[in-house]
C-alpha cells in the first residue's frame, strides 16, 4: 500500500516491524465489527423539525463493505444508539449482523456470535471510549480507529485511518485487510 498505516502505542518496534505485524494481523481477519456514529458517519446527528433523524454515510464505504462481503469477510454493526436510518443502511448493504442500542458492545458481539458471526480473528473499528469493551473482546485481534477519534482510542488502536470518521474510512480498512490476504482485486 502506498498509504502509511501505523501501529500506535508503546510497541518498542521499528516502523518496519510494526508494518509487518499489522500486515500479519490484517491477514488473519475473518470479520469486521463496525461502530456507526463517528466511523460510518461523521458523528453528527441531524434531527428534522418533524422528529426525523438524518445521518450522512459515505458511498465509498458502502462499496468497500460490499467488496469485503464478496471476499468472504463477515460484517457486523454494533452501535450504542437505536436508529431506523442505521437499519436501512445495513439492509441496503446486505449486513445481517446488526445490534443497536448496545450499552455493552462486547456483550452485543457475544450475541452476534451466537447467531453465527465469526468468533475469532475479528477487526473492530470504533472512535470513542465506549468502544473499549469491544476492543478488549477475546475475538478481536485487530483494533482500528479513525483519524479524529478520542485520544485514548488513538493510543490503543493498532490501525488508524488517514481519513476522518464518515469520510470513507472503510475504504482504507478494506484495502489493508484484502491486500494482506492477497485478495485485493484492483492491482
Feature map (PLM): residue ranges:
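Mg2+-dependent phosphoryl-transfer enzymes with acidic/Ser/Thr/Gly-rich catalytic loops
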Residues: 54-58, 92-93, 97-99, 106-187
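Substrate-recognition element of Asp-dependent hydrolases with the DxDx(T/V) motif
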Residues: 65-89, 135
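A positional/architectural concept
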Residues: 40-70
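Asp-based phosphoryl-transfer active-site loop
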Residues: 28-44, 135, 170
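Amphipathic coiled-coil/heptad-repeat helices and related helical stalk/stem segments
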Residues: 15-18, 61, 105, 128
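Non-catalytic pre-domain segments flanking phosphatase-related domains
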Residues: 1-34
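Short coil/turn segments at beta-strand junctions that form active-site/ligand-binding loops
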Residues: 28-30, 73, 120-121, 141
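Short secondary-structure boundary segments
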Residues: 36, 80-81, 102, 147-149
Amino acid at each position: 500500500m502506498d498509504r502509511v498505516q501505523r501501529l500506535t502505542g508503546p510497541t518498542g518496534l521499528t516502523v518496519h516491524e510494526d508494518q509487518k505485524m499489522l500486515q500479519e494481523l490484517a491477514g488473519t481477519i475473518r470479520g469486521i465489527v463496525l461502530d456507526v456514529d463517528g466511523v460510518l458517519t461523521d458523528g453528527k446527528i441531524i434531527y428534522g423539525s418533524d422528529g426525523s433523524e438524518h445521518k450522512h454515510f459515505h458511498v465509498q464505504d458502502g462499496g468497500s463493505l460490499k467488496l469485503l462481503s464478496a471476499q468472504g469477510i463477515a460484517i457486523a454493526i454494533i452501535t450504542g444508539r437505536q436508529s431506523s436510518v442505521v437499519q436501512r443502511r445495513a439492509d441496503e448493504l446486505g449486513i445481517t449482523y446488526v445490534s443497536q442500542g448496545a450499552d455493552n458492545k462486547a456483550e452485543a458481539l457475544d450475541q452476534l456470535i451466537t447467531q453465527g458471526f465469526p468468533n475469532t480473528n475479528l477487526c473492530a473499528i470504533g472512535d470513542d471510549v465506549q468502544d473499549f469493551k469491544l476492543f478488549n473482546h477475546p475475538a478481536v485481534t485487530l483494533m482500528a480507529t479513525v483519524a479524529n477519534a478520542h485520544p485514548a482510542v488513538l493510543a490503543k488502536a493498532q490501525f488508524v485511518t488517514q481519513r476522518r470518521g464518515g469520510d470513507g474510512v472503510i475504504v482504507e480498512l478494506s484495502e489493508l485487510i484484502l491486500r494482506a490476504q492477497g485478495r485485493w482485486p484492483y492491482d
